């Protein structure tokens, strides 16, 4: 716990990442706010949302990576662990390979500066037809960065009681894990089938795995 609270870490994300931030806070680990053009981070966890830090909307992965690059260059002398996650709208088949190539370049830049990078697999949604590109990116991440620490969000959000939630071999976020009227996201509202926000209780559970990944990469 002391290591996670003391190791300067910056995590940039969109709304599913905000669910995880809220979940971490429920476990006693608050992310300090990181905002636009900010050039400082505090010891421990720092978090920023792309809609604010950019601002850049979902569905613009290359713009997001430029925001990530600019933020990293502002704080690279201070931060020890750096991470960002795509939103579910950022990963499409038509430009997935180009996004992956730019992501790999960005990771290399972070590591060349002596900073540790924490990978996060892209979130999936409830509607299975939208998820194959996201699964393909996950598989690429696991193969390309096999020796790195990867927070496999996609894996855990598509499991319920050890059973995989899938349709015809395509994973989906489980009904028990998604934001519904029975268990809404803390801040993102009730989801339609094309979204993938996290039930507040599940976000707190999944955030433990995120925090453990931060610990692992900081060792």
Region annotations inferred by a language model:
Residues 1-33, 192-196, 211-219:
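N-terminal module-boundary/linker segments of secreted carbohydrate-active enzymes
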Residues 8-12, 31-42, 50-52, 80-86, ...:
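Structural recognition of the beta-strand scaffold that forms the well-ordered cores
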Residues 11, 19, 23-26, 67, ...:
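Extracytoplasmic/secreted proteins, especially bacterial periplasmic and envelope-associated proteins
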Residues 19-20, 90-99, 126-132, 158-163:
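Extracytoplasmic/secreted cell-surface and envelope-processing proteins
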Residues 22, 26-68, 154, 163-187:
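Divalent cation-coordinating acidic motifs and surrounding scaffolds
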Residues 61-100, 122-125:
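Oxyanion-hole/transition-state-stabilizing segment in secreted/luminal serine hydrolases
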Residues 122-162:
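Substrate-gating cap/lid alpha-helix
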Residues 171-219:
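Histidine-centered active-site loop/cap adjacent to the catalytic His
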């Amino acid at each position: 716990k002391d290591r996670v609270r003391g190791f300067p870490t910056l995590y940039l994300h969109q709304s599913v990442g905000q669910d995880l931030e809220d979940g971490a806070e429920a476990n006693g680990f608050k992310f300090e706010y990181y905002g636009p053009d900010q050039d400082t981070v505090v010891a421990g966890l720092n978090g920023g949302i792309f809609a604010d830090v950019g601002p850049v909307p979902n569905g613009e992965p290359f713009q997001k990576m430029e925001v990530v690059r600019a933020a990293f260059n502002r704080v690279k002398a201070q931060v020890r662990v750096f991470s960002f996650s795509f939103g579910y709208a950022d990963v499409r088949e038509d430009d997935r390979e180009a996004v992956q190539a730019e992501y790999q370049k960005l990771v290399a830049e972070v590591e060349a500066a002596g900073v540790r990078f924490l990978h996060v697999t892209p979130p999936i949604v409830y509607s299975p037809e939208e998820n194959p590109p996201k699964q393909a990116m996950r598989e690429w991440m696991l193969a390309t960065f096999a020796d790195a620490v990867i927070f496999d969000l996609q894996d855990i959000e598509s499991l319920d009681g050890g059973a995989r939630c899938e349709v015809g071999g395509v994973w989906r976020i489980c009904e028990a894990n998604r934001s519904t009227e029975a268990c809404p996201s803390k801040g993102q509202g009730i989801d339609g089938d094309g979204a993938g926000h996290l039930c507040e209780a599940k976000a707190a559970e999944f955030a433990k795995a995120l925090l453990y990944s931060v610990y692992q990469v900081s060792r």
